[in-house]
């Protein structure tokens, strides 16, 4: 799988306001999201390290109780097993990468 055309991947809305297309490589899960202002991802944690790369718009990312605004040029890195949540402050797009891959994604 050296190339993936993400435009051909099915779109899944989960949670409401977050539309994702995702795929796995051997060791990593990649998720391309379109998000709507006001939508959120509840506080949670998982064993994977997670990286949020905002392409357009702004997200409030809370990592272990500390809030920061993620926007183009500012990447949020969530260590594994650390509680985090996300709120969309605007409409936008982001790429979220998990390592190792998330077999539960789907």
Residue ranges and their predicted role:
Residues 15-16, 29-46:
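Conserved short histidine dyad/triad with adjacent acidic residue
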Residues 1-27, 77:
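A short, N-terminal "cap"/entry segment at the start of jelly-roll beta-barrel domains
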Residues 80-104:
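Ligand-binding loop in jelly-roll beta-barrel domains
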Residues 34-36, 46-61:
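Short, conserved beta-strand element in jelly-roll/cupin
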Residues 55-56, 71-72, 90:
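A cytosolic small-molecule/anion-sensing beta-strand core signal
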Residues 65-80:
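Short acidic-glycine-tyrosine-enriched beta hairpin
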Residues 29, 51, 58-60, 67, ...:
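Structural motif
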């Amino acid at each position: 799988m050296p190339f993936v055309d993400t435009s051909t991947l099915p779109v899944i809305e989960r949670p409401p306001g977050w539309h994702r297309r995702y795929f796995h490589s051997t060791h990593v899960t990649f998720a391309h999201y379109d998000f709507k202002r006001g939508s959120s991802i509840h506080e949670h944690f998982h064993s994977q390290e997670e990286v949020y790369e905002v392409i357009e718009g702004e997200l409030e990312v809370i990592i272990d109780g500390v809030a920061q605004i993620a926007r183009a040029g500012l990447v949020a890195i969530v260590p594994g097993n650390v509680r985090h949540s996300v709120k969309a402050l605007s409409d936008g797009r982001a790429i979220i990468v998990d390592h190792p891959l998330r077999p539960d994604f789907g």
